[in-house]
Amino acid sequence: MINRFLLAILFTLVLSGSASANEMISIEKYLSDKDPSDHAATTYSLIRCSGLELFFATIMQEKAPDVSKFSKQKSSEFALFASKLDSVNSNRKFEDSAKNMINSSQEIMSYYIKDGKKNWSKTGSYFLESYIDDDRLLCDYLYKSYIQK
């Protein structure tokens, strides 16, 4: 009886370890059930893009310092845009919104790092064949269409 119990626990641990979920879902999936006029969802999407760019800056720092620097700049621009939007829609002081957005961006970056490492161990890429690549495409579109002017 005890052996069956231990075997069941071991089996559960093995299954849970191999089926480890990602820290986040894609931005597009997150937005799929949100109203287009939902300012909180828009702000979250922008700050996700900021965190994603910090993630890219981190993984590119040694091999491509220029790319890393540009990703940091893009991260700052996304965070600034999100801070302005948050400040206007929440009636918070801009400084408070900016502090919140920067902290959120750094936390989101840590989730991308965790998921990127998991993806690296499976595919040899930090982001290809994962939601991270989908986020990259969406954030590139947002940057070119709305941020970079």
Segments from the language model and where they lie:
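Short, charged/polar, low-complexity loop and linker segments
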Residues: 30-31
